[in-house]
Amino acid sequence: MSRIINVAAAQLGPIQRSDTRRDVVERLLAHLRQAHAMGCQLVVFPELALTTFFPRWYMEDPAEIDAFYESEMPGAQTRVLFETARKLGIGFYLGYAELAVEQGVKRRFNTSILVNQNGDIIGKYRKVHLPGHAEHEPWRAFQHLEKHYFEPGESFDVWRGFGGVMGMALCNDRRWSETYRVMGLQGAEMILLGYNTPVHNPPAPEHDDLSMFHNHLVMQAGAYQNGTWVVGVAKAGKEEGCEMIGGSCIIAPSGEIVAACSTKGDELAIARCDLDLCLSYKSTTFNFDRHRRPEAYGLITERRGAVEPAPEAAVTA
């Protein structure tokens, strides 16, 4: 018997700095209600879905910085999301900036949660691959200070929910094949992935025309090579003067895009996702147990950066 989940990739248009949490939550609620009306069981929102992408600015005032974070989830302004999800019987994935106090120490993470159809949090993920830079770089029109405002997460976990095995990732994680493989080795059948990606890359502007191609390429490869669904959901449009690529989509285990957003605003892309389709890839071409050779992959965990080989020398054939 097929295991079907009707999934909505809930793209958001730009969120401006002047927008309140209440403004944004109302947009998320509209997505939940529309997705429910269209028969969905799961809605996937973007990374940092409650605020503008604040790492584009260098800020020194702690109070100004803290205003972008959630110190509890659900909190006073987000509880209605959980209540509505429970009332509608629909689950969701949500990305946000997390402010945690652990052993008396204040910590900040770029976080996502998975909420089931009862309104309960069943999984939490903290972004592992933080892009950008840690120090203010005045030459940039927009900063990319994720390394300044967040600590990295430590693991790629999976959770049982929605009738299958679910994984989570955030934005830059999608560019690293290890992201998908670690979850694939835990049997992931659907990976939920929110992102905020600018069109322009100041250190390498020659790549700008390829930004959408690269965005889809890495998610399609990750889906196919691990026999898993991937739901990639963006913040899109011109946000505080910065162009965001959008391109939200749902990708099958075949690597094919089966649903996609076509605008730069609030939009749903919906697909009927059969989790049993994963098996045809996990049991054949990508049967890990039969074909993988982990004994040959030691460098992946032993070495961080590339090291070139020694000068050319003759070898014994």
Language model features with spans:
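Short beta-strand segments enriched in small/hydrophobic residues
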Residues: M1-I15
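Short, glycine-anchored, charge-dense loop/turn motifs used at functional sites
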Residues: V7, L114-I122, I251-A259
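Residue-level recognition of beta-strand->loop/alpha-helix junctions
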Residues: Q11-G13, P46, R126, Y195, ...
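Cys-nucleophile CN-hydrolase/nitrilase-fold catalytic domain and related Cys-dependent amidase chemistry
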Residues: R21-R126, G132-H133, T197-A221, Q225-T228
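CN hydrolase (nitrilase-like) catalytic-core segments centered on the catalytic cysteine
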Residues: M73-Y93, V165, C171-A269
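Active-site catalytic loop in hydrolytic enzyme cores
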Residues: E83, A100-P203, H207-L217, S283-N287
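Short, well-ordered beta-strand micro-motif
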Residues: L114, R160, I250, I270-R272
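A short C-terminal boundary segment appended to hydrolase-like catalytic domains
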Residues: L279-A317
